[in-house]
Structures are given as structure tokens and as C-alpha cells.
């Protein structure tokens, strides 16, 4: 297996221009495809997940042109639901941001489409979404195991009253919201259980509004969406930088700055993961906010005990930053780590122990006490981009660290390690 050894880093200082947000890129691509008119997306993320969405749209007959660096995409809108005359199978890798929204959108009208992906995708639950779509009239078969992909979709979604469980993934609600305006009837979505990752719903609602559709959001418990609507292209849309990707650089600044500045997001960002910077500030770092940047400067870091449900992806970065904080850090209400690219609670606990931390892994929490001195280790990444990026922070000590399968960062950030090296001074 390929590996990358990072030598100890004495200091980080500099500016990182963030790649486009994965969450925003894939939502914007799908809405542009469904909309009337041509949409030019700029700062689109070039990564595996976005390529899977683009390939799927292409197979569904959507016309688009991509710039050579794949960050500018001109999409000719379909002006309504995506249809395929022939039966079709779409391979979506391990891209949840493609699988979930497409599973809903392709239930409009009458298609015969199979959505499949990598082995890990077949282990990621989608039953709550399938159940909700069936309530709205959709014909869906789970081809291997009930409640998991691959799915066979044969259209039929009408709208109406739909209940969806919000406790596992907000992407199920996102998928329903984006599909509902194109249904023949109005849709009323009622949330069962606690809604996780609420800020990701705000991204969805923001993008729908950008494409001309308003949703009646009743305290995140009930959403009313009028049917028989049409998305309208906004013309040009700039994809903001990826706030989850920003977390590694901001944490590096907190641990070994200097000052590290990330551009492409700022105080008015639509992504909830910018709140990650507040956690670093609470730990003792100095954070500065601009309209299109966030900067973080080193401080003496202290442990925190926090509910991280609102920033599950960025919260992983706090787990490795905790290695540099005084005291025991507890991250709570993170059950949905278990249904991501890998079981992230198990993976994080396992790898933190390798570098010497004392770790308590609960069903929905993790508690981390750093060692007096970090130990050298080879870090398994579980084909999970965030594991690789989180554990790069171990090098901000006097101990090197080896990252196995470093190229797994291609899911969201292909040149992550080059960007980290650019702002680093080795010990």
C-alpha cells in the first residue's frame, strides 16, 4: 500500500485558497441540471464525489462543458425532471452527496434506473429515504439488502404527506426537499426524531432559493413545499470554499502558528462547518473573520467538552487537535460518524490510541486524553479522506507520522498534502 511519511513540522504560516465545497458543488450541479436555463458554476470542486455526480448527469443526457481544470462548469438545464428512455445503471462510488439526492430526483416521472456504488456504499443506510419516497408513491427496490443500495428506481413520486427520520443523516431530508418542488402535488415533510446536521439543511434551502424555490420551514420539524414548480437558473453561481476542508489548516494554525488564513469562506458562509473556528477559539486559539476569509493564530489550547452534532465532519479535526490540548476532550452526539465513509468513531479511536492517546469510545461520543509525548505510528485511513487529513496534524509535534493510502483525500481535496507542505516549516 502507498504511504506518505510527514516529518515533524515546527511552524505553519500562510494562506490557503480552499477548493470548492463538496456539499455545495453536488447540490448546485443537480439543481442546475433540473433548472430551466444555463448555469455557469465557478470554483466547482474537482474530486471523486463530484466526478461521480457529473458522470451520472451525463448518462442521464444532461449537457455540460467543463474547463480544463474542472472548476468551471456550464450546465444546460433540463427544465424539469431527469428522464432516461432506456433502463440505466449509474455507478456512484462512495459519494453520499450524489447517491441520496439522485435517489430522490430520479423517482420523478417513470424511469427504470439502478443506482449502485463501491462496497462501502452498500453498507451506508438509505432506508429512511427509501421509506419516505415510498410514502410519496415512489417504486423502489433494494436489490441486495433492504434499506441499503443498490437501488432500482421506477419513478412514481407524487408528493403528499411524508414522514422522514432525521436522526441518521440530513442528506435524506436534503434529497426530499430538492425533489419535492417538481412533484405533481404539494409535499409536506414531517421530521421524526432529532434532525442531525441542521446546518447542512440550511445549505440545501439556500441553494433552492438561489434557483428560485422557497420552502416553508417550520422550525426544522415540518417543511411544506409546493408542487408543480420549476427551478430557474441564477445564471452564474460561485461555489464557496469547503469549510470542512478549512478545518485542518485552521487547526494547524491553532496548534503551530503563526497565522494560517483560509480564503473562499467567511463570516457569511452558507456552510455550518465554519462554526468549527468557534471551537478552536474556545480551546484558546485566536480567530479573525472576514467576508471571504477566516484566520487562526496559535494559542495555548485547552480541552473542551461539547455537543458536535451541528458540525460532524469538522468535529473529527477537533479529535486530533485534542492531542495538543491540556486535559481531556469529549465530543458528544456524534453517532452519525458511524455511518459515514467508514465507522469514524471506531476508526478515530483506534488510530488515536496508536499515537499514544487514552481514548474512550462510546456509542455516540469519544473522550480523548493526550499522552505526554506522541508516539510514531502508521495511520490506517479506512479509505476515508477525513481520516488522512485529520491525522496529518500529528506531524505538528516532534514526532513524524506515516499516513497509509494518502491519495484517499481525492474524495474532496486531491492536493491536500501539497497545500499543507506549502505552509509548513519543518523542524
UniProtKB/Swiss-Prot annotation:
NCBIfam families: aroA (TIGR01356). Belongs to the EPSP synthase family. Monomer. This is 3-phosphoshikimate 1-carboxyvinyltransferase. CDD domains: EPSP_synthase. Keywords: Amino-acid biosynthesis, Aromatic amino acid biosynthesis, Cytoplasm, Transferase. It is an enzyme of class 2 (transferase). Pathway: Metabolic intermediate biosynthesis; chorismate biosynthesis; chorismate from D-erythrose 4-phosphate and phosphoenolpyruvate: step 6/7. It comes from Klebsiella pneumoniae subsp. pneumoniae (strain ATCC 700721 / MGH 78578). Catalyzes the transfer of the enolpyruvyl moiety of phosphoenolpyruvate (PEP) to the 5-hydroxyl of shikimate-3-phosphate (S3P) to produce enolpyruvyl shikimate-3-phosphate and inorganic phosphate. Its EC number is 2.5.1.19. 3-phosphoshikimate binds at residues 22-23, 27, 169-171, 197, 313, 336, 340. It is found in: Cytoplasm. One of its GO terms (molecular function) is 3-phosphoshikimate 1-carboxyvinyltransferase activity. InterPro entries: Enolpyruvate_Tfrase_dom, Enolpyruvate_Tfrase_sf, EPSP_synthase, EPSP_synthase_CS, RNA3'P_cycl/enolpyr_Trfase_a/b. One of its GO terms (biological process) is aromatic amino acid family biosynthetic process. It catalyses: 3-phosphoshikimate + phosphoenolpyruvate = 5-O-(1-carboxyvinyl)-3-phosphoshikimate + phosphate. GO terms for cellular component: cytoplasm. The active site is at residue 313.
Amino acid at each position: 500500500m502507498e504511504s506518505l511519511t510527514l516529518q515533524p513540522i515546527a511552524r505553519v504560516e500562510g494562506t490557503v485558497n480552499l477548493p470548492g465545497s463538496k456539499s455545495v458543488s453536488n447540490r448546485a450541479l443537480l439543481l442546475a441540471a433540473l433548472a430551466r436555463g444555463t448555469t455557469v458554476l465557478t470554483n466547482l470542486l474537482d474530486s471523486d464525489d463530484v466526478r461521480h455526480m457529473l458522470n451520472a448527469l451525463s448518462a442521464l443526457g444532461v449537457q455540460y462543458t467543463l474547463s480544463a481544470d474542472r472548476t468551471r462548469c456550464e450546465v444546460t438545464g433540463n427544465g424539469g425532471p431527469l428522464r432516461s428512455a432506456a433502463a440505466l445503471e449509474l455507478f456512484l462510488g462512495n459519494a453520499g452527496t450524489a447517491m441520496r439526492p439522485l435517489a430522490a430526483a430520479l423517482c420523478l416521472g417513470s424511469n427504470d434506473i439502478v443506482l449502485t456504488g463501491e462496497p462501502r456504499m452498500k453498507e451506508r443506510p438509505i432506508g429512511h429515504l427509501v421509506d419516505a419516497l415510498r410514502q410519496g408513491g415512489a417504486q423502489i427496490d433494494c436489490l441486495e439488502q433492504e434499506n441499503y443500495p443498490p437501488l432500482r428506481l421506477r419513478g412514481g413520486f407524487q408528493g403528499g404527506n411524508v414522514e422522514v427520520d432525521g436522526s441518521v443523516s440530513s442528506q435524506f431530508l436534503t434529497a426530499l426537499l430538492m425533489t419535492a418542488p417538481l412533484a405533481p402535488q404539494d409535499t409536506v415533510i414531517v421530521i421524526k426524531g432529532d434532525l442531525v446536521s441542521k446546518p447542512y439543511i440550511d445549505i440545501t434551502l439556500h441553494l433552492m432559493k438561489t434557483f428560485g424555490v422557497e420552502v416553508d420551514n417550520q422550525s426544522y420539524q415540518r417543511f411544506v413545499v409546493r408542487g408543480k414548480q420549476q427551478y430557474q437558473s441564477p445564471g452564474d453561481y460561485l461555489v464557496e470554499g469547503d469549510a470542512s476542508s478549512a478545518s485542518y489548516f485552521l487547526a494547524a494554525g491553532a496548534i503551530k502558528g503563526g497565522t494560517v488564513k483560509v480564503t473562499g469562506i467567511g463570516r457569511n458562509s452558507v456552510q455550518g462547518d465554519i462554526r468549527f473556528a468557534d471551537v478552536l477559539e474556545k480551546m484558546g486559539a485566536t480567530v479573525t473573520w472576514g467576508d471571504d476569509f477566516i484566520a487562526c493564530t496559535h494559542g495555548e489550547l485547552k480541552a473542551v467538552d461539547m455537543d458536535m452534532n451541528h458540525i460532524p465532519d469538522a468535529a473529527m479535526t477537533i479529535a486530533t487537535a485534542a492531542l495538543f490540548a491540556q486535559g481531556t476532550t469529549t465530543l458528544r452526539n456524534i453517532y452519525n460518524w458511524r455511518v459515514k465513509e467508514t465507522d469514524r468513531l471506531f476508526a478515530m479511536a483506534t488510530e488515536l490510541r496508536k499515537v499514544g492517546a487514552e481514548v474512550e469510545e462510546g456509542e455516540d461520543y469519544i473522550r480523548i486524553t493526550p499522552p505526554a509525548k506522541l508516539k510514531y505510528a502508521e495511520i490506517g485511513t479506512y479509505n476515508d479522506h477525513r481520516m488522512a487529513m485529520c491525522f496529518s496534524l500529528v506531524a505538528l509535534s516532534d514526532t513524524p507520522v506515516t499516513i497509509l493510502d494518502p491519495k484517499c483525500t481525492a474524495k474532496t481535496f486531491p492536493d491536500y498534502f501539497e497545500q499543507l507542505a506549502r505552509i509548513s516549516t519543518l523542524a
